[in-house]
Design a protein with these regions (language model features):
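A short alpha/beta connector and helix-capping loop motif
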Residues: 81-113
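SAM cofactor-binding core of SAM-dependent methyltransferases
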Residues: 1-58, 66-69, 73, 100-102, ...
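Rossmann-like AdoMet/SAM-dependent catalytic core
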Residues: 1-6, 11, 52-63, 100-172
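A structural signal for short, well-ordered beta-strand segments and their strand-loop junctions
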Residues: 17, 72, 93-97, 130-135, ...
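Alpha-helix C-terminal capping segments
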Residues: 28, 32, 83-87, 131-132
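Active-site glycine- and acidic-residue-rich loops that bind
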Residues: 72-84
Length: 172
């Protein structure tokens, strides 16, 4: 499943798509042919030449605070660290995969097994993002845009969806 395909496929958004696994990258190229996408075959690292900032900087797409609408981080391991390493860019919305089996009061961060909602939400606050919903992924809105959202209780225990909640919404 893709967190972004609806946007670039059906709504005409431009996308930079990064895939480290070559066979999946080849599928990505085939699936995005004819759309306004820029595909990059690269593993993302926390620092160095393969940091998210450096990889995005090598694309031909000019990214500004106004036109960088969404970043989705789904690396199946150290999403937390990649989210925390973003320095140059300020997307309006960031989606970060979490290990949803942890309740919203639990701190957990691992390079090999993901992170809890609480841990990534606290990280988001330190880098200027507010966590506003959790569906297995944590959805963050840039601090300067939070006032545009409806008046709602965005506390973690309210926005958290457990694996059972997610399964029931998907008809499982």
């Amino acid at each position: 499943d893709s967190n972004t395909a609806l946007l670039w496929r059906d709504m005409g958004y431009r996308a930079i798509l990064i895939e480290g696994i070559e066979s999946r990258f080849n599928d990505l190229i085939n699936n995005t042919r004819g759309y306004d996408t820029f595909c990059i075959n690269n593993y993302v690292q926390e620092t160095g030449d393969d940091s998210i900032d450096n990889i995005l900087g090598r694309s031909t797409v000019e990214l500004t605070d106004d036109n960088f609408v969404l970043m989705s981080i789904d690396i199946d391991s150290f999403d937390y660290y990649v989210f925390g390493s973003i320095k140059k860019y300020r997307p309006k919305v960031v989606i970060v995969e979490t290990s949803s089996g942890y309740t919203p009061d639990r701190d957990f961060v691992s390079r090999n097994a993901g992170c809890s909602l609480k841990s990534v939400a606290e990280l988001g606050e330190t880098i200027g993002y507010k966590c506003v919903i959790h569906t297995g992924n944590a959805y963050f809105v840039r601090d300067d845009l939070v006032d545009l959202l409806p008046d709602y209780d965005y506390s973690l225990d309210v926005i958290y969806s457990s694996p059972a909640d997610i399964d029931s919404r998907q008809g499982k």
